[in-house]
């Protein structure tokens, strides 16, 4: 056994300049595992709770309480534990916290230790993280969903939907997918520049232009960039949307005026689903995330029955990487895919359980970053380890996003002939 002899947390900064937590786990052999924890801007009501300090420092967003919880309470319980006992490590922390949403010790504190322990274990064995977690069957490179236009809570653009993503489904490899995606990104910059629009980027590296025509203007602009790059819109490149509908759900209605002003419409649940179906019939949209509000189960059911047979419907705020909510969705036939965010649930063990439950039920899974990221690229390894087949980790800019893509390039190179890139096969038919 390789025993944990030291656990140390510190406060660092994420890509938005907000504090976050980083944890080191050290074994008796002097092997280090280090993990930094991400943070979201649009967070689901049912997510595990990250612990923030409050007060004036860092506008209340400090994480020194979470750091202290790791360095005192958690460390004292885990020192002497084998670093290979991942399930036990996570269970001890869950029991220590004692709340359903990890609000006592903080999901950020618990997750930092959970991921750092896994990294230390992998390093002890001299294995890459994806191989340690996924074993010999971990060989699927995820298809990237590249977020090239940002709206909603991720930018100041007057568009309700949070993300407009391109998917290089005709790529033969992850490397080629990156080439296609980055070329389109740079062509989009020129298209926007030629229209006199801003080419500043949002939290996830996508552009945040003031597109007066709203959603369809964004889609048409992407179409032009795809064609300008020499690719076929609707064949080489498909589209994914993250509506983040909970962000503009007001008094039981989908209120687009929150982000789009007087030009925005107010829709009922059925009207919202019908609108998404209309968009999916007009444009090559093969994936829609959070098209309905997180607790609008009836709306989700209607949407799933309407287009779930041909469109991937991803539950993010709906499922929050939580097996309890996912189990309900599966039993009621709601959505057909789960977004996977490690900090929504707070431990590696629970993340793996959610992905396994989804796959066993025939749901697809999409590994995902958060809008507040760091240079940590753990989710790249997790996407391969769990054979997710898809990943959301931002646009082709900002090193906090590119670090994940670069790690996947390394993994594909390492796997060589064993690497499998599913392309369009990764998506729900």
From Swiss-Prot:
One of its GO terms (cellular component) is cell surface. Pathway: Carbohydrate degradation; glycolysis; pyruvate from D-glyceraldehyde 3-phosphate: step 4/5. Keywords: Cytoplasm, Glycolysis, Lyase, Magnesium, Metal-binding, Secreted. PROSITE patterns: ENOLASE (PS00164). GO terms for biological process: glycolytic process. Its cofactor is Mg(2+). It catalyses: (2R)-2-phosphoglycerate = phosphoenolpyruvate + H2O. CDD domains: enolase (cd03313). The active site is at residues 204, 341. Its EC number is 4.2.1.11. GO terms for molecular function: magnesium ion binding; phosphopyruvate hydratase activity. (2R)-2-phosphoglycerate binds at residues 162, 341, 370-371, 392. Binds a second Mg(2+) ion via substrate during catalysis. It comes from the Bacteria. It is found in: Cytoplasm; Secreted; Cell surface. SMART domains: Enolase_C, Enolase_N. The keyword Lyase applies. Its main location: cytoplasm. Mg(2+) binds at residues 242, 289, 316. HAMAP family: Enolase. Belongs to the enolase family. Catalyzes the reversible conversion of 2-phosphoglycerate (2-PG) into phosphoenolpyruvate (PEP). It is essential for the degradation of carbohydrates via glycolysis. This is Enolase. The lineage of its organism: Bacteria, Pseudomonadati, Bacteroidota, Flavobacteriia, Flavobacteriales.
